[in-house]
Amino acid sequence: MAELKAVHQDAADAGHRSHVSVKAVWRELSSVVKIGIVNSNLITTFAGMWLAFYFTGEHFLENLHLVFFTLFGAALVIAGSCAINNYIDRDIDQYMERTKARPTVTGTMDPRRVLWLGIGLVAIGEMGLLMTTVTAAVVGLIGMATYVFLYTLWTKRHYTINTVVGSISGAVPPVIGWTAVDPEFHIVPLILFLIMFLWQPPHFLALAMKRCEEYRAAGIPMLPVVHGFAMTKRQIIVWVACLLPLPFYLFSLGVPFLIVATLLNVGWLLLGLAGLKMKDDIKWAKWMFVYSLNYLTILFVAMIIATLW
């Protein structure tokens, strides 16, 4: 009887260890591919695809295969690009609080395996996008190349303009979504690209202000590290102001959308201007960062809702 209990206990312990192991592996993989970035970019990818269905008159439910291959392909290309970024940045990630626990830094994952994982994910993702349109696959490849080569390998470590260069790749997902449905040129994906492109500098510069000393320790020439908070604030305000006219190019989504989008833009701009008088720069940067996250979510959800009226 005692032996039987021991067997059951051993089995239970083995099951528990297996469960813990699976959770640990998933946690490490999620960190390597930056699952949060993947998820947020899939929201904009879906929005671009949804708007393409709306403006071209195609039916969503009749094109579920496109939806699947677009989201599948985009997710893997983004995840793979992030994994390659983790491989490249493993030498500087150790100096930053938010990145020092990544598997490529702690050694819990072989960096070479992370690199090959990234390359494999990008390759499979590109094949997925090719199941939609060649244009979508090309756009995805441009986004990956910009993020890995122009941003991670080149500008991130050498120039304060790194944030702007990185914004190109971050603005690609909604264009992937659109071109997967309609590869022809249209003003809407261009506006979606510009919204995402202009949104990213104030978002990431606010983050850079919050993490200024970490970036300094890592030797990354972010704008607040090189030129200080005053110039960073002014640039953030300029980037936010550039967003103001863009919603009006989407006037066909209706007046309610224009009102929501304009209120979001004006609110962000007013918060930015308030920073010129605030003495607590870090507190202001936190407010700007949180606002930017809510801004993007509300704006793209509003776009989708506007098509349902």
Swiss-Prot record:
Entry GO CC: plasma membrane
- Going by the record, the broad EC class of this enzyme is transferase
Subcellular location per the Swiss-Prot or TrEMBL entry: Cell membrane
- UniProt record, GO biological process: heme O biosynthetic process
Among CDD domains, the record links this protein to: PT_UbiA_Cox10 (cd13957)
Which EC numbers does the record give? 2.5.1.141
Q: In which pathway does it act?
A: Porphyrin-containing compound metabolism; heme O biosynthesis; heme O from protoheme: step 1/1
- Please tell me whether the keyword Cell cycle is annotated for this protein: no
- What are the protein's UniProt keywords? Cell membrane, Heme biosynthesis, Membrane, Transferase, Transmembrane, Transmembrane helix
In Pfam terms, one family for this protein is UbiA
Q: Write out the GO MF terms.
A: protoheme IX farnesyltransferase activity
Matching HAMAP family: CyoE_CtaB
Q: Give the function comment from the record.
A: Converts heme B (protoheme IX) to heme O by substitution of the vinyl group on carbon 2 of heme B porphyrin ring with a hydroxyethyl farnesyl side group.
What further fact does the record state? Carbon 2 of the heme B porphyrin ring is defined according to the Fischer nomenclature.
Give the protein name, as stated in the record: Protoheme IX farnesyltransferase
